[in-house]
């Protein structure tokens, strides 16, 4: 395209667009942001705005679309949610200041990971940007949140990368534009940067300059050992600088994170436990949504962070527990204060990047005064004492803001009325001139009459000649020497004095001068506030922590959560545990025990579909997770030993993008667990092997269960419909059979959701199908076919060879028939036991008792 064939304004646009080819350019023209050419076409489609034309280029109409300046945020929010980045190009020159178009430049770039405007952010979600820098052995990660000032780095490996990204929930990911860039399994927006931007040397230079240090050892980073992490952190910091058009001043140091700090959870586990998102992608009901009673958005975000980062450090957990206990008696007064607290964390971020608004400062002022009033009595909690000691430190900032900012300032700085009265004498004078000009004129008139003795003297104003002193013709010749003639009339003369001229200049320009001075003073206030950012961030974190801890305290009281105990030996003992989410969704929830220790490491869980197996397993994992956040747990009592990680393999779906079937996804997740599980890991396995043929699935499930028992020795909850596996406790003392009970009443079934010892008697699949609404004809056909299969299995059961053996540790092929037949025997024993268990002789009439006796006799014949 030829620039010479278009207007100067369009030439300017094309020059700016050439520097931002991968972004939409919002080009400020008066009260609109305009988009041109391909940007206009794309924006019109994404935002459903009108596409029009303006002028021509090379004989082709130039396509154009626009959004109003005052409503730009809502359009930016929509674009960012779609993963788009937008360059904001503002008018920075004076209109009509010279020839050609007004000067414009890109003042910032809005990307999914670098948002600070409250209108573009979810109140309860942390917005992070992550940089990924790979080498042959390791992958360096660095992530930051411009809203909180978080800035961290970590070394990881390729097989753990996607799990780390799932944990961090990145809004934007920076990758080197090279062949060595790792493959990601994430929906987050990916931004490609030149590979040289991830160079460790350049990264270390930028980071040391930013933090004002000689090297990064003080942050735990060695230039050789952590080279890829340093490269990632440098690329990230530089990207933030370029997009914000300034170097951020609020990044809270650079910390090195390690696996030993938190209980590990892979991406599948976070998804299956529905911590902050349901399996269907919704925000509720989740663990977070059910627990979140926080009074502040800062508290809600910290709660989500704690849930995704359960602690390993027992001392830190106990400190939180002590705080929760101490807050039980102080919850109400604390909530009264917290409910009045604004989002200090995000206000501080906007101050840091220079886009804070007047009402941000007013909210900050009021919040700091409110925090200073929090007076927790002697708590006995060292954590609470530390937190409450932070708030008085910000009182000087609050006092400064009280002096500087109006009690209720305007929304926009351009409207004035932002800087408080008495803060600056010149501004007060300009306002006095604007608001009290008539008083000045009357005072001047009285003063001049007294000075000159001229009785006809009047001080007046008109739009043509401005301010003047008018004297009658007879007294005009007596005017003082400092009176300068301005206009001669038939019966009067008009004069101007230096004092009146100065006043005129002030009045005529007072509004513009006042607005300009207010902007200057406001910028000065922001500059001073930036020096207090560490204190503001500290106060925000303390307020958020108090909010979460008080929420934990309320949960303990309102929902009967108890303080879990921690042991140094392997154990998961839970008395009457409850699922924290499900119990809030149903009228009555059946509580259940859990007992795992060094003697019983694998619970083989059987029972009907809809019986509650998956709920029970998730319940155990969530109780363990909550205990390690410092929260009390939904149970009558709980004792938990050392836990490093939680793994789940519950449900699956096709991964069409990677050409992987449901069964392949299941096996991949299972393989990861078997390779990584240790004695201090909790494993949940739900119906492993169901996606293939019966014998294949059974053989795999058997081998996986044995691997968990013999090799991994993890605490495992293993739910299955393969009743043939229920023999395992006979071969392995560390395995125990448990089942979810159900009760048949005629042709109906009642799920008791109660964990009981031993294997289940049957799966009740047809009964569940009936509940699902299958046609009666199909149900009858299924029952008939089931009866035939059961009879055939009983009739064709072969005599066991006395030399049949179980698979050995030396790698022998498993004798599937052996454990199938043995399990069938156990299965029929379970049926008889269940029949007897459900029999109540005292409630039977003689005829009913005789009928039950014949039924039991027939049942015995069928299994003999």
Swiss-Prot record:
Binding site residues for ATP = 607-614
Give the superkingdom in one word. Answer: Bacteria
One cellular-component annotation, GO: cytosol
What are the GO BP annotations of this UniProt entry? mismatch repair
> Which Pfam family is an annotated match for this chain, by its short name?
MutS_IV
SMART domains of this UniProt entry? MUTSac, MUTSd
What are the protein's UniProt keywords? ATP-binding, DNA damage, DNA repair, DNA-binding, Nucleotide-binding
**One Gene Ontology term of the molecular function aspect:** mismatched DNA binding
Described function:
This protein is involved in the repair of mismatches in DNA. It is possible that it carries out the mismatch recognition step. This protein has a weak ATPase activity.
* Family membership noted in the UniProt record: Belongs to the DNA mismatch repair MutS family.
What is the protein name given in its UniProt record?
DNA mismatch repair protein MutS
The protein's organism comes out as Neisseria gonorrhoeae (strain NCCP11945)
Taxonomic lineage of the native organism:
Bacteria, Pseudomonadati, Pseudomonadota, Betaproteobacteria, Neisseriales
Q: Which gene encodes it?
A: mutS
């Amino acid at each position: 395209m030829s620039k010479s064939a278009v207007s100067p304004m369009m030439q300017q646009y094309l020059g700016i667009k050439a520097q931002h080819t991968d972004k939409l350019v919002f080009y400020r023209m008066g009260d609109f942001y305009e988009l041109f050419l391909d940007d206009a076409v794309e924006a019109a489609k994404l935002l459903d705005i009108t596409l029009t034309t303006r002028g021509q280029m090379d004989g082709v109409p130039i396509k154009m679309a626009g959004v109003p300046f005052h409503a730009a945020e809502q359009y930016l929010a929509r674009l960012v949610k779609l993963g788009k980045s937008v360059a904001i190009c503002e008018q920075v020159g004076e209109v009509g200041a010279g020839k050609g178009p007004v000067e414009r430049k890109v003042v910032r770039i809005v990307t999914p990971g670098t948002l600070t405007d409250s209108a573009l952010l979810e109140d309860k979600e942390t917005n992070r940007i992550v940089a990924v820098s790979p080498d042959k052995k390791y992958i360096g990660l660095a992530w930051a949140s411009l809203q909180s000032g978080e800035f961290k780095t970590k070394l990881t490996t390729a097989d753990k990368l996607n799990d780390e990204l799932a944990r961090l929930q990145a809004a934007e990911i920076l990758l080197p534009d090279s062949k060595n860039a790792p493959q990601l399994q994430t929906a987050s927006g990916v931004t490609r940067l030149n590979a040289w931007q991830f160079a460790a040397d350049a990264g270390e230079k930028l980071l040391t300059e930013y933090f004002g240090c000689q090297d990064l050892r003080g942050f735990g980073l060695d230039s050789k050992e952590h080279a890829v992490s340093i490269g990632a952190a440098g690329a990230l910091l530089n990207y933030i600088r370029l997009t914000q058009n300034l170097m951020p001043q609020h990044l809270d140091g650079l910390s090195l994170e390690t696996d030993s700090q938190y209980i590990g959870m892979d991406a599948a586990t976070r998804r299956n436990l529905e911590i902050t998102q349901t399996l269907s992608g919704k925000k509720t009901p989740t663990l977070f949504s059910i627990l979140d009673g926080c009074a502040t958005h800062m508290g809600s975000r910290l709660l989500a962070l704690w849930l995704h980062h359960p602690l390993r450090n027992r001392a830190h957990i106990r400190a939180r527990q002590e705080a929760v206990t101490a807050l039980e008696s102080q919850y109400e007064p604390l909530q009264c204060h917290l409910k009045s607290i604004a989002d200090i964390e995000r206000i501080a971020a906007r101050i840091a990047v220079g886009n804070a608004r007047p009402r941000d400062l007013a909210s900050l002022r009021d919040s700091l005064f409110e925090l200073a009033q929090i007076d927790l009595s002697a708590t006995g909690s060292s954590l609470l004492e530390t937190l409450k000691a932070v708030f008085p430190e910000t009182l000087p900032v609050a006092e400064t803001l009280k002096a500087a900012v109006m009690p209720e300032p305007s929304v926009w700085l351009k409207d004035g009325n932002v800087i408080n009265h008495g803060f600056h004498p010149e501004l007060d004078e300009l306002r006095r001139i604007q608001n009290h000009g008539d008083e000045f004129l009357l005072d001047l008139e009285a003063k001049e009459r007294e000075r000159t003795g001229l009785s006809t003297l009047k001080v007046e104003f008109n739009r043509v000649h401005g301010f003047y002193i008018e004297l009658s013709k007879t007294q005009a010749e007596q005017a003082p020497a400092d009176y300068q003639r301005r206009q001669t009339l038939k019966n009067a003369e008009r004069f101007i004095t230096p004092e009146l001229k100065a006043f005129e200049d002030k009045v005529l320009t007072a509004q513009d001068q006042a607005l300009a001075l207010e902007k200057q003073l406001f910028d000065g206030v922001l500059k001073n506030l930036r020096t207090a950012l560490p204190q503001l961030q500290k106060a925000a974190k303390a307020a958020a922590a108090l909010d979460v801890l008080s929420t934990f305290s309320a949960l303990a009281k309102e929902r009967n959560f108890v303080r879990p105990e921690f042991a140094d030996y392997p154990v998961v003992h839970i008395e009457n545990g409850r699922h924290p989410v499900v119990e809030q969704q149903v009228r009555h929830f059946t509580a259940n025990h859990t007992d795992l220790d060094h003697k019983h490491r694998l619970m083989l869980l059987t029972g009907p579909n809809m019986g509650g197996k998956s709920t029970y397993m998730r319940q155990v994992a969530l109780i363990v997770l909550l205990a390690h956040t410092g929260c009390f747990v939904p149970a009558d009592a709980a004792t938990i030993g050392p836990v490093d990680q939680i793994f789940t393999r519950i449900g699956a779906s096709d991964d069409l993008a990677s050409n992987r079937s449901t069964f392949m996804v299941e096996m991949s997740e299972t393989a990861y667990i078997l390779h990584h599980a240790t004695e201090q890991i909790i494993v949940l396995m739900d119906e492993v092997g169901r996606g293939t043929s019966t014998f294949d699935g059974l053989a795999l499930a058997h081998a996986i269960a044995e691997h968990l028992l013999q090799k991994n020795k993890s605490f495992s909850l293993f739910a299955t419909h393969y009743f043939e596996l229920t023999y395992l406790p006979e071969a392995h003392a560390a395995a125990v059979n448990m089942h979810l009970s159900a009760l048949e009443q005629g042709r109906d079934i009642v799920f008791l959701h109660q964990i009981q010892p031993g294997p289940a008697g049957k799966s009740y699949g047809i009964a569940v199908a009936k509940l699902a609404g299958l046609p009666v004809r199909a149900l009858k056909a299924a029952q008939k076919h089931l009866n035939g299969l059961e009879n055939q299995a009983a009739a064709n059961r072969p005599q066991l060879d006395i030399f049949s053996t179980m698979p050995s540790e030396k790698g022998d092929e498993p004798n599937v028939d052996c454990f199938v037949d043995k399990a069938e025997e156990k299965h029929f024993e379970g049926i008889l036991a269940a029949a007897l268990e459900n029999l109540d002789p005292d409630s039977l009439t003689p005829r009913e008792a005789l009928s039950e006796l014949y039924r039991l006799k027939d049942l015995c014949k069928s299994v003999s």
